[in-house]
């Protein structure tokens, strides 16, 4: 049975229903019981009566050590947060008239970011009259995309935004 844990579940005296479908300490079904009988069973076992599914008919209550349950749940949540990887967007700035050596340095940095699992935004800023030659900037972006095609996919094609042209690359995920 999957327990949906909210911030606070109804426990012991907070439960305000007549009867509950009772689940034992080991997960065994104890049947539909009046609330008073369920609470006396919980007291006898020295555990809490926790209403785990209040929307069910009749509501489902379980005998459990609530403190231990809450601790385990928080521990599980913390573990899941650790496993999540945060993807950041790194930026590599280029120029439409970039030299080969500079391009290779920027390319090396971009590849490093992609290998670490980050997305890369490749941008070109047009200065002065360079804006009239957008095709040169598009060629530089295309060369960058072609040089990283073995480890990245184009997430967003080359696009103009004011005096800036950019595209976004994402690492090829291993989870196919």
From Swiss-Prot:
Q: Which GO terms describe its biological process?
A: ribosome disassembly
Name its cellular compartments: Cytoplasm
Q: Which organism is it from?
A: Streptococcus pyogenes serotype M1
Q: Does the keyword Protein biosynthesis apply?
A: yes
Question: What is the annotated quaternary arrangement, including any partners?
Answer: Monomer.
- Any idea which GO molecular function terms this record carries? ribosome binding; translation initiation factor activity
* Source organism superkingdom: Bacteria
Q: Which GO terms describe its cellular component?
A: cytosol; membrane
The UniProt keywords, alphabetically, are:
Cytoplasm, Initiation factor, Protein biosynthesis
The record lists the membrane-crossing segments as: none
> Which Pfam families does the UniProt record give?
IF3_C, IF3_N
- What is the name listed in the Swiss-Prot or TrEMBL entry for this protein? Translation initiation factor IF-3
Record-stated family: Belongs to the IF-3 family.
- What is the recorded function of this protein according to its Swiss-Prot or TrEMBL entry? IF-3 binds to the 30S ribosomal subunit and shifts the equilibrium between 70S ribosomes and their 50S and 30S subunits in favor of the free subunits, thus enhancing the availability of 30S subunits on which protein synthesis initiation begins.
């Amino acid at each position: 049975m999957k327990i949906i844990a909210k911030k606070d579940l109804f426990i012991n005296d907070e439960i305000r229903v007549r009867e509950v479908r009772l689940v034992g300490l080991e997960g065994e079904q104890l049947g539909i019981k009046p609330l008073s009988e369920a609470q006396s069973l919980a007291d006898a076992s020295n555990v809490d009566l926790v209403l785990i599914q209040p929307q069910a008919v009749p509501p489902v209550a379980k005998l459990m050590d609530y403190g231990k349950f809450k601790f385990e749940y928080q521990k599980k949540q913390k573990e899941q947060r650790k496993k999540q990887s945060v993807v950041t967007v790194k930026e590599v700035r280029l120029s439409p008239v970039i030299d080969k050596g500079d391009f290779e340095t920027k390319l090396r940095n971009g590849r490093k970011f992609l290998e670490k699992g980050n997305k890369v935004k490749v941008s070109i800023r047009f200065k002065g009259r360079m804006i009239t030659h957008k095709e040169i900037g598009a060629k530089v972006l295309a060369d960058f995309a072609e040089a990283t095609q073995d480890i990245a996919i184009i997430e967003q094609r080359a696009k103009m935004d004011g005096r800036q042209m950019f595209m976004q690359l994402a690492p090829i995920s291993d989870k196919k």
